[in-house]
Amino acid sequence: MQTVARKASVERVTNETTIALTLTIEGEGNVRVTTGFGMLDHMLTLTAFWAGFDLDLTCNGDMHIDAHHTAEDVALCLGQALATALDDRKGIARVGFARVPMDEALAEVTLDISGRPWLEWRGDEYLPPVIAGEEKDLWREFHKAFASAARMNLHVSYLYGKNGHHLLESASKGLGLALRQAVRRDRQTVLSTKGSLD
């Protein structure tokens, strides 16, 4: 039986950012990300690669101010693309969980593509105040925007660690692995006793 490729493209143009992305859920390892913020490029590349997605993403943002608008708008577009590619989410496993170590750091990511947006962000006291020249709260805002646009419950917990890069990398890989589990098709119907995900 041939299945339709789960794929979506999103474009967003505002006074703050210009974004174009294409996301393919059943990917072949083709990830190309250019946002103007190297740490964001790195973390998005890790997430897409570990999820098994193809991702082609470019963003031209107001980086002369800071990376906030770029990170938030990229997350909104990525979440929107995921929600569109999954359509009614029929047949997906829906839930994913991962713990990925990175040297001294360990983060845990749990998610449910339930149609109910929520971000639970724990343990960010382990993150240094500034990472790659940006305040640490940028990463909470990124994940909040992604969870909202993708309509998912997303719990990110930093369990321990010292190096900000390592902590973010642990969480980004964990997000990818959790997404890989959650988008997997393993049934013919919606995994919900109410018959729909919203």
Curated annotation (Swiss-Prot):
UniProt subcellular location: Cytoplasm
Keywords, comma-separated and alphabetical: Amino-acid biosynthesis, Cytoplasm, Histidine biosynthesis, Lyase
Origin superkingdom: Bacteria
GO molecular function, one term: imidazoleglycerol-phosphate dehydratase activity
Catalytic activity: D-erythro-1-(imidazol-4-yl)glycerol 3-phosphate = 3-(imidazol-4-yl)-2-oxopropyl phosphate + H2O
Family: Belongs to the imidazoleglycerol-phosphate dehydratase family.
Full protein name: Imidazoleglycerol-phosphate dehydratase
Upper taxonomic lineage: Bacteria, Pseudomonadati, Thermodesulfobacteriota, Desulfovibrionia, Desulfovibrionales
